[in-house]
Amino acid sequence: MEFQPLTIKHLESRLKKDLEVDPSWFVPHIQNFISYNPKGCFALVNRDKTLGIVTTTLYDNIGWIGWLYVDDSFRHQGLGERLMRKAIEYINKNKIYSVVIEAVREAATLYQRIGFESQFETHHFKLYPDKIKPNQNNNFQILPISSIPREKLADFDFKYFHQNRHELFKIIVNNPKFSGYIALENKKIIGYIFVTEDSKSLQVSPLVINLNHPHKYELTNSLLRVACNDKEKPLYLRCPSLRKQYFDFLTSIGAEPTGYFTYRMFLGKQYEIESEGVLSLGCPGKG
């Protein structure tokens, strides 16, 4: 049994067994993680059999762990913990001592045993396109992310996530399953959205707006409407339970709580969590 650098070939056994996974979405998504940090994504292999995988995403002073998966034929043998500890070891070797995960509830006990602490719940909301109101405000523009320099987007993003994510943006804008849009007012960014699409839904990943903007509802609806791109698939949002106003805001624009939530957890040093205005977090594994 050994760790190997994660490659797309390591995904084949999961794709064959798990018919719920959409390969056209899953494969390019994992490729983003490998492209961003090829030395920090691992497969646990026994001979030619892939037993599990894990990814890491490093920013300025936090390291995200994501996509922890163990083949169901090999569960309850400690392999999940082994993969987690490998990821933690890699992050710490890079002199990053704040390790962050978005944990499914079923795995929370494992993470707590390793030493992770809960910070908040991330609640999932569903929004149907026909609930999104048309934009009646002409004071701002909604444009494709490609309309502005990535440095400008990264600077705006930094105010909310407190990490430089420029290199990640550079990778995901080339993923055909991602689309991104910005809201501009007087040439200034006041919000942005990324959406990723699979065969059944659209997933907001993330949605950030200036909540002090006088037309925040119109701004949010405008970003969501263009992100739908005339599709009828539901949008899913991952809303951090940091402030009750977030839930109230999303329900006021027509989003419905699904009842499902995950846990944001961390290990090691405290870090600065997202600032006010992050209505939906990004994909688990990269924040």
Predicted regions and their residues:
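Amide-forming acyltransferase catalytic core, primarily the GNAT-like/NAT-type
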Residues: 12-14, 116-203
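Conserved beta-strand in the GNAT
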Residues: 43, 48-57, 64-69, 182, ...
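Conserved acetyl-CoA-binding loop-helix of GNAT-fold acetyltransferases
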Residues: 70, 76-89, 93, 113, ...
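Active-site/acyl-donor-binding loops of N-acyltransferases
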Residues: 109, 114-133, 234-287
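Flexible loop/N-cap segments at domain edges
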Residues: 178-180, 185-196, 200-239
